[in-house]
Amino acid sequence: MHPQGRAASPQLLLGLFLVLLLLLQLSAPSSASENPKVKQKALIRQREVVDLYNGMCLQGPAGVPGRDGSPGANGIPGTPGIPGRDGFKGEKGECLRESFEESWTPNYKQCSWSSLNYGIDLGKIAECTFTKMRSNSALRVLFSGSLRLKCRNACCQRWYFTFNGAECSGPLPIEAIIYLDQGSPELNSTINIHRTSSVEGLCEGIGAGLVDVAIWVGTCSDYPKGDASTGWNSVSRIIIEELPK
């Protein structure tokens, strides 16, 4: 193999072109200067040689590598794929029940009297007004005070609560009774015992808002009344408390 030669320089090519041009002129007939057609033909050949030389492209040295271009714009989204297969059936879960209870704020009230000394046998003894906050709650009521009943013959008295003028119906009235039977007229009928007692219970079904809670005294069914006394010589009180159901 022969070693590769160097590329021809521009000066060498120019020299070769001039020599070629000179040869063309020398090869032209001497009568060319006298014959216009021949002269014109020679000029055309010279121009062809010049055009051929001008059309030659010389390969220069390699240029500096260019910089990376800017990233292209995002392409068009592809079409949706084929739906996958159904997964395996999961295990049976457990049912959890959670109860969210509203926080409860205590709501209660007490009305008290130092000495009622109420000697009526029928009617309202005392009253206490209470503000009930919820409709789905219950009221716990308590009356505490001295009670007394006396009579010559068998008698019965009943102490009970009312709510806005009506006895409790959820579920039943709240009451307490005292029954007294001397047994015979010969026995002492002047027994006069005052004893601290209580009337207490829960009542449901009362709407929210103001509730007038009262303690009353009345008769028992099928029995005559006696001589009743409430709150003698001692403190009496009504306590009302709202409770969640």
From Swiss-Prot:
- According to the UniProt entry, where is the signal peptide? 1-32
Q: Source gene?
A: Cthrc1
Name the chain's protein.
Collagen triple helix repeat-containing protein 1
Tell me where in or outside the cell this protein is found.
Answer: Secreted, Extracellular space, Extracellular matrix
Q: Does the entry feature the keyword Zinc-finger, yes or no?
A: no
Induction or repression: Strongly induced in carotid arteries after injury (balloon catheter injury model). By various growth factor (BMP4, TGFB1) in NIH 3T3 cell line.
One Gene Ontology term of the molecular function aspect: Wnt-protein binding
Q: In which tissues is it expressed?
A: Expressed after injury in the carotid arteries (at protein level). Expressed in brain, lung, and after injury in fibroblasts of the adventitia and the neointima of the arteries.
Biological process GO terms, please? Answer: cell migration; cochlea morphogenesis; cyclooxygenase pathway; establishment of planar polarity involved in neural tube closure; inner ear receptor cell stereocilium organization; negative regulation of canonical Wnt signaling pathway; ossification involved in bone remodeling; osteoblast differentiation
The taxonomy runs: Eukaryota, Metazoa, Chordata, Craniata, Vertebrata
The UniProt function text for this chain reads:
Its overexpression in smooth muscle cell lines increases their migratory ability and inhibits collagen type I expression. May act as a negative regulator of collagen matrix deposition.
**Per its UniProt entry, which superkingdom is the organism in?**
Eukaryota
Membrane-crossing residue ranges in chain numbering: none
Q: Which species expresses this protein natively?
A: Rattus norvegicus
Residues bearing carbohydrate:
N188
